[in-house]
């Protein structure tokens, strides 16, 4: 029996929500370990659509325990709004089935404002953030001035913490010629949040260790994708946290040895939101068609996603940086009907062939994809639930992807419905 980490193997939006929901049926606990409410995902269950951003996918299964780990940055108001929306849809959410790490960093209104100010200050310096305060909150965490959930349990300690926080933020506000934040107002807001949030507070590392020793199955749910990792992604066009699989340990307080299987999620093509390099991007009618078929718009922001062919170089790189054991390939059905399909198998950089994406921003912008053409298929793959339901050429495409990225396909998704999944290897039994 293995505890399983699920990570995006591209730039996010790979369909992690559906796969995590599908796997959560076999898990006892589902844990978020990084990011915030900037990465939304949609789940379709029995015809009902649910949109999640901050909450783990496990909340949709009442018998499971969901956990938000210390690696997450936590927006109190966004949390309460999301809980209310799901409760209105009939989803039961309470401290009985949801716990939040007591040492999680809080996102405050000042973080959201700073995020927006920076992003909108100049198009030349914009990196495409969601303006939800994620980056500034992580900055305060690393700068050792963040307000954490546990601080709400002892309100008397908050004033000096707020003063320390504002010593930094009000200096920035003055630089923007904006009025300073009022410490009293922030204290008032945090005081109001305390009774609503503290019932969920938990010493998460201890809770998970106890559950692990009891033999419970733990599913670690990543947000965004490995190519947005602050260290290993396309810097500076990345998120502000580590999104690779190793963060599952750091972001929950579990040791690395507790992770038994890493499942990477990737689309049968590639998408990206916002700025940054994208070697296989299609700016033609084919790219538009993939976007229309795949409904490639952000769950939270509604932003249109850039679309391109499958990039085996990038996914192979992610397989290495995340230690991925198996891949879940999603949205294969979007490629139905194309006469031919291109797959990137390498790059040319300044006249030389390379087998990875360089770390430098300048070099990243100069790489040119080397494509291999694969014959398409006319028969539909949508809603397939076994290999026998797939066209022969679609199976050849999947097998070629496996060869190029050096990793087996463990799951194949053919629609947003959780039942439309072909299982090759069960990650919990690997």
Swiss-Prot record:
<feature type="binding site">
    <location>
        <begin position="413"/>
        <end position="415"/>
    </location>
    <ligand>
        <name>GTP</name>
    </ligand>
</feature>
<comment type="subunit">
    <text>Homodimer.</text>
</comment>
<comment type="similarity">
    <text>Belongs to the adenylosuccinate synthetase family.</text>
</comment>
<feature type="binding site" description="in other chain">
    <location>
        <begin position="13"/>
        <end position="16"/>
    </location>
    <ligand>
        <name>IMP</name>
    </ligand>
</feature>
<feature type="active site" description="Proton acceptor">
    <location>
        <position position="13"/>
    </location>
</feature>
<dbReference type="GO" id="GO:0000287">
    <property type="term" value="F:magnesium ion binding"/>
</dbReference>
<feature type="binding site">
    <location>
        <position position="40"/>
    </location>
    <ligand>
        <name>Mg(2+)</name>
    </ligand>
</feature>
<keyword id="KW-0436">Ligase</keyword>
<dbReference type="InterPro" id="IPR042110">
    <property type="entry name" value="Adenylosuccinate_synth_dom2"/>
</dbReference>
<feature type="binding site" description="in other chain">
    <location>
        <position position="224"/>
    </location>
    <ligand>
        <name>IMP</name>
    </ligand>
</feature>
<feature type="binding site">
    <location>
        <begin position="331"/>
        <end position="333"/>
    </location>
    <ligand>
        <name>GTP</name>
    </ligand>
</feature>
<feature type="binding site">
    <location>
        <position position="144"/>
    </location>
    <ligand>
        <name>IMP</name>
    </ligand>
</feature>
<feature type="binding site" description="in other chain">
    <location>
        <position position="239"/>
    </location>
    <ligand>
        <name>IMP</name>
    </ligand>
</feature>
<dbReference type="InterPro" id="IPR018220">
    <property type="entry name" value="Adenylosuccin_syn_GTP-bd"/>
</dbReference>
<dbReference type="InterPro" id="IPR027417">
    <property type="entry name" value="P-loop_NTPase"/>
</dbReference>
<dbReference type="InterPro" id="IPR042111">
    <property type="entry name" value="Adenylosuccinate_synth_dom3"/>
</dbReference>
<comment type="pathway">
    <text>Purine metabolism; AMP biosynthesis via de novo pathway; AMP from IMP: step 1/2.</text>
</comment>
<dbReference type="GO" id="GO:0004019">
    <property type="term" value="F:adenylosuccinate synthase activity"/>
</dbReference>
<dbReference type="GO" id="GO:0046040">
    <property type="term" value="P:IMP metabolic process"/>
</dbReference>
<feature type="binding site">
    <location>
        <position position="13"/>
    </location>
    <ligand>
        <name>Mg(2+)</name>
    </ligand>
</feature>
<keyword id="KW-0342">GTP-binding</keyword>
<dbReference type="InterPro" id="IPR033128">
    <property type="entry name" value="Adenylosuccin_syn_Lys_AS"/>
</dbReference>
<dbReference type="GO" id="GO:0005525">
    <property type="term" value="F:GTP binding"/>
</dbReference>
<keyword id="KW-0547">Nucleotide-binding</keyword>
<dbReference type="Pfam" id="PF00709">
    <property type="entry name" value="Adenylsucc_synt"/>
</dbReference>
<dbReference type="GO" id="GO:0005737">
    <property type="term" value="C:cytoplasm"/>
</dbReference>
<feature type="binding site" description="in other chain">
    <location>
        <begin position="38"/>
        <end position="41"/>
    </location>
    <ligand>
        <name>IMP</name>
    </ligand>
</feature>
<feature type="active site" description="Proton donor">
    <location>
        <position position="41"/>
    </location>
</feature>
<feature type="binding site" description="in other chain">
    <location>
        <position position="303"/>
    </location>
    <ligand>
        <name>IMP</name>
    </ligand>
</feature>
<feature type="binding site">
    <location>
        <begin position="12"/>
        <end position="18"/>
    </location>
    <ligand>
        <name>GTP</name>
    </ligand>
</feature>
<protein>
    <recommendedName>
        <fullName>Adenylosuccinate synthetase</fullName>
        <ecNumber>6.3.4.4</ecNumber>
    </recommendedName>
</protein>
<comment type="function">
    <text>Plays an important role in the de novo pathway of purine nucleotide biosynthesis. Catalyzes the first committed step in the biosynthesis of AMP from IMP.</text>
</comment>
<feature type="binding site">
    <location>
        <begin position="299"/>
        <end position="305"/>
    </location>
    <ligand>
        <name>substrate</name>
    </ligand>
</feature>
<dbReference type="GO" id="GO:0044208">
    <property type="term" value="P:'de novo' AMP biosynthetic process"/>
</dbReference>
<keyword id="KW-0479">Metal-binding</keyword>
<keyword id="KW-0658">Purine biosynthesis</keyword>
<dbReference type="InterPro" id="IPR042109">
    <property type="entry name" value="Adenylosuccinate_synth_dom1"/>
</dbReference>
<feature type="binding site">
    <location>
        <position position="305"/>
    </location>
    <ligand>
        <name>GTP</name>
    </ligand>
</feature>
<dbReference type="InterPro" id="IPR001114">
    <property type="entry name" value="Adenylosuccinate_synthetase"/>
</dbReference>
<feature type="binding site">
    <location>
        <begin position="40"/>
        <end position="42"/>
    </location>
    <ligand>
        <name>GTP</name>
    </ligand>
</feature>
<keyword id="KW-0963">Cytoplasm</keyword>
<keyword id="KW-0460">Magnesium</keyword>
